[in-house]
Every structure is written in structure tokens, then in C-alpha cells.
């Protein structure tokens, strides 16, 4: 049996992972599960999967979790330290589905633990960790298998390396507002942004999809993860979300990965890698249409911004700044403190106003840049978006 941990087991990716593990209980021994604050669901998952450890980051719910697991023998860890403790458990496979930059430190602990495969759903770890994180995976001989459907697709095609690759293409659904005019985008609501046409996702990533910042972050992730220059990475809009990634080779051949739009498929691949496990999903192309279009950079400027970041003199630092500012702006949008179109404006202004450039040699360097960027973004929102102060 494979020993496995699932960090962020109560989020959208985590729940899908748990569903798959429940169907494959004879294949996996669940060592640890974690959540930020959803103690009730975590306790239920831990009992169903006979987990050895659980961790809850929010100390406020420690007592509730402890009481929910009385008599089970399941060990409870709490706070940031508790999360790092379970991240440090040596397992065969660790699924990291913690949302945002909060996932970076646990990933670093997983790498140091002796775990050999990380099924990674946290793109921010690659975006912000950059070469520092990837160098550490090489030193420790750790394989990252991406769960993001686009990077999972590219990963599958590039199993023999990226030699002779001309370009990689990441597909984007276009999000909730693909066909909205610029004028319509000025008045969209939080509820509308969370109603994704093809994917069932969490709040933050649904908003990122609507602004196309999700794809902007994925471009940076692809650059770092696959060691491919920015000018060889392209994003196109594919509303049906059937083709997840395309690799174009120098001889003119194009390799595309097709699958239904359900995260259970790339999660299953990551769980089973380097093998494959049977799933009931059967794609019938006779009942599908495949359409493509260029992204509209005027309505969705995030893609252009990510390329500017990658082509800047300090791409690693600016990637951290971009991610931090976006997390702040999305949070304010979800709280109705700023409008939809102001999300990317805040991000762009934060990148433009950040000037504390230093070498990035440690996790603390990344965290310091992240914190300073958040402070700048919050100040921009306070001063520029006066209607919401």
C-alpha cells in the first residue's frame, strides 16, 4: 500500500481526492489530512479513511476537532506548526491542495520529509517558489506531478523531456464572463463570478478564472515547471474545456491531451503515477464541438501582465508580487470592497510600485516579498478605490 497525505483535504480538490481514496482504500494508507478551519468535514474524512494524523491550522477549532475525534486514536495537530508537522511525515505520495501562498511552506516541508512524489494542486508554490523550490526537488530527488489539468496534460506529453518542443499551449475556458463586453464587466457581481460554466471550483480560483489571472499564473507555473521560455508558451480560449494542453513539436506534430472537464481525472493520474487507474469517464467526441479563440487582452489584461512579469529584469520577485497582490484583490472583491475590473488594476499597480528588489535565497525572502506586496496592494485599495474605503 502507498502511504499518502492530503494537505487541504476539505477544499474542492481535496474533497475530490478523498472521494477517489475512498474507492481505493485497499491501495492507500492515509497518514495525514489537513484543513484550515472545516473541522467537521475533516473529522468525517479522517474516520472514513482511518487517517493516523489530522491538522487544523485555525487554532479556534482545535477543541471542536479534538472532541469530534474522541476515541478514534487519530492524533490531532494544530496551528501552522501542526500543519508543518504533518507535512513533514515521510510518505510515498503527498497531495498538496492548500490554497494560495499558504501552500508554499508545507510544500517545502514535504520536499524535506523524504516523500518522493508530490501531487501538486497549489500553483502558487511553483509561481512563488520558482527556482528555489525546484532546485530543492532536484536535490531531494522529488517528482512533482501537477494536478492543474493544463499542466497535468503537458506533463504527460513531456514525459520524455522537452527536447524539440516548439511551443506549449495552455487552454482557458474563458471563465464566467467570456462573452461580456467591457461595459458589462463593470457591473458584474460576486455571485456571477463564482458561476463557472464548465468547472466546479473554489471561490478564489473561480474569480481567477473569470479575470483570467488563473491562466496568467499558469503561464508562470509552466515556465518554471517545464523550463520553457516565456515566448514559447501561449494561452488560447477553448470554452468547452475538452483539450487541456497542447505541445507543438518542431517537426509540425501537435500532441493534445483531451478529457472531460472533471478534476477527478488529473487527480487520479497524479495519485496513480507512473501507472494509470481505471475511471468511468468516457469522452465521446461525436457529441462534442471544439472551438478556439484568441484571448481579448483589453477585457482580460492579466495574460499580458504575466508575460511582462516573466520578461522583466526580476521575474521571480515580480511573480511573487503579482500573486500576493492578486490574493489581496480577490479577497477584497469577494467581500464586495472593490469591483471586478479593479482586481487586475490593483495587481498591475502593485507590481509597478514594488521596488524592494533583493536576491531570493530562502523561504523567508519569499515571505518578506509577499508580505510587503500585500501591504502595497492594501494601501492601493485604500487610496485608489475611495468609494469602498
Curated annotation (Swiss-Prot):
SUPFAM superfamilies: 1-deoxy-D-xylulose-5-phosphate reductoisomerase, C-terminal domain, Glyceraldehyde-3-phosphate dehydrogenase-like, C-terminal domain, NAD(P)-binding Rossmann-fold domains. Its cofactor is Mg(2+); Mn(2+). Pfam families: DXP_redisom_C, DXP_reductoisom, DXPR_C. Its EC number is 1.1.1.267. Keywords: Isoprene biosynthesis, Manganese, Metal-binding, NADP, Oxidoreductase. NADPH binds at residues 10-13, 38, 122, 124, 202. InterPro entries: DXP_reductoisomerase, DXP_reductoisomerase_C, DXP_reductoisomerase_N, DXPR_C, DXPR_C_sf, NAD(P)-bd_dom_sf. It is an enzyme of class 1 (oxidoreductase). Mn(2+) binds at residues 148, 150, 218. It catalyses: 2-C-methyl-D-erythritol 4-phosphate + NADP(+) = 1-deoxy-D-xylulose 5-phosphate + NADPH + H(+). One of its GO terms (molecular function) is 1-deoxy-D-xylulose-5-phosphate reductoisomerase activity. GO terms for biological process: isopentenyl diphosphate biosynthetic process, methylerythritol 4-phosphate pathway involved in terpenoid biosynthetic process. 1-deoxy-D-xylulose 5-phosphate binds at residues 123, 149-150, 173, 196, 209, 214-215, 218. Pathway: Isoprenoid biosynthesis; isopentenyl diphosphate biosynthesis via DXP pathway; isopentenyl diphosphate from 1-deoxy-D-xylulose 5-phosphate: step 1/6. Belongs to the DXR family. Catalyzes the NADPH-dependent rearrangement and reduction of 1-deoxy-D-xylulose-5-phosphate (DXP) to 2-C-methyl-D-erythritol 4-phosphate (MEP). PANTHER family: 1-DEOXY-D-XYLULOSE 5-PHOSPHATE REDUCTOISOMERASE, 1-DEOXY-D-XYLULOSE 5-PHOSPHATE REDUCTOISOMERASE, CHLOROPLASTIC. NCBIfam families: Dxr. This is 1-deoxy-D-xylulose 5-phosphate reductoisomerase.
